[in-house]
């Protein structure tokens, strides 16, 4: 019996069966969705993946190239965001190194001796540390709020620098979120938090799961679409 891979070219493979008559592939965020008729067997799904392997690989390369084109310079004046609010990087020399938010500026201090690529690397590191710290605090607040509403009890919350996914929930109720998520507007962040908490009720992406998400986020389809369209820019 053929086994459907869980991951392909860095994308999570998600099979969605329905009453549809044809099979189709979509790349949505960090997921490769295979939408097939109910009658289609796993072996046929594997054949579809093998047939479309070149297309999938080329799409992944295309998305990676888009991210490279939008590569950051980490210089003063460069724009960042926090819950949809525009912030601007301001690089200073000397004093205590690190990043702090003052008004609309991410004040990032580096050593005078750090120049060129080393300076960019340090600025990136300081910014990521700041974002991770902020993400943990803000996401913990949102998880606590929505876990009471949804009536689930997550065991642990972590923040990581995921390359493709926005969040995850394992079978022990441990939640992990991408720190880049807090660059999105609040309603988008709320959607991802609700999404992962609903996985504590239903681990897959079945119709029942999406019905649960809709109970707590009636506009989840719009939020999901926004994330698909703007996700690559948030990851920068």
Region roles according to the model:
Residues 196:
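Walker B catalytic acidic pair
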């Amino acid at each position: 019996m053929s086994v459907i891979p869980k991951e392909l070219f860095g994308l999570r493979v998600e099979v969605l069966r329905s009453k549809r008559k044809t099979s189709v592939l979509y790349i949505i965020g960090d997921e490769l969705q295979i939408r097939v008729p109910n009658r289609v067997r796993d072996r046929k799904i594997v054949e579809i993946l093998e047939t479309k392997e070149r297309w999938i690989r080329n799409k992944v390369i295309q998305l990676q190239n888009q991210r490279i084109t939008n590569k950051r310079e980490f210089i003063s004046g460069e724009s960042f965001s926090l819950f949809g609010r525009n912030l601007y990087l301001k690089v200073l020399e000397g004093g205590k190194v690190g990043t702090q938010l003052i008004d609309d500026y991410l004040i990032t201090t580096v050593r005078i001796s750090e120049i060129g690529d080393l300076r960019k690397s340090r600025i990136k590191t300081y910014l990521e540390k700041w974002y991770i710290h902020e993400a943990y605090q803000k996401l913990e607040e949102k998880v606590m709020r929505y876990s009471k509403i949804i009536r689930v009890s997550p065991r642990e919350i972590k923040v990581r620098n995921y390359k493709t996914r926005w969040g995850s929930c394992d079978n022990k109720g441990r939640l992990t979120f991408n720190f880049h998520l807090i660059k999105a507007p609040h309603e988008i962040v709320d959607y991802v938090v609700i999404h992962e908490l609903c996985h504590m009720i239903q681990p897959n992406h079945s119709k029942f799961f999406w019905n649960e998400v809709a109970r707590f986020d009636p506009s989840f389809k719009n939020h999901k679409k926004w994330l698909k369209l703007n996700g690559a820019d948030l990851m920068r």
